[in-house]
């Protein structure tokens, strides 16, 4: 009887409290998503959203295994070919990549279902995406980026101006709150499909 040895290698994650590891063995690769902070959001809801996308015929990583007590889930591995990497390759068909991404976003926004069972069997209801939530999301730029790259002297003035502009833009949007919002839809998370 031969045992299957697996190798875990940390891979670049996103701006969350999740850590990602590629699990390699001689059978297949998978991704381990590990989170000790905000476990509900970073494991349960993450897997539920993927399940909702799959149910609506949108390619998303399937859940292979979960161990909530040990702070991880194991999901399908789509490889390393992100749209970001492909856009930066010489000779890539950038127009086609953008068109496919926009078509995918349009398909996602047509999802009307707002409830899905998580892997613990409980219903998860998508939150309403209102003006306040949009403001908080837009402010992430200040929370994650400006304080890292702008001097403290300029930071407060810049953040006040950015907040003012965000509020102005939101006040002119006229949100209907009936669209699925995929909060991680960006070129570093979109894979070649």
Set out the residue ranges of the language-model regions.
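Active-site acidic catalytic loop and adjacent metal/ATP-binding pocket
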Residues: 18-23, 32, 108-109, 166-193
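Short secondary-structure junctions
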Residues: 1-6, 54-58
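Amphipathic coiled-coil/heptad-repeat helices and related helical stalk/stem segments
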Residues: 16, 46, 162-165
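ATP-binding glycine-rich phosphate-binding loop
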Residues: 3-24
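ATP-binding pocket architecture of kinase catalytic cores
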Residues: 21-136, 150, 174
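Glycine-rich loop motifs involved in handling phospho/adenylate chemistry
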Residues: 8-12, 126-129, 182
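Residue-level signal for WD-repeat beta-propeller blades
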Residues: 14, 66-67, 193
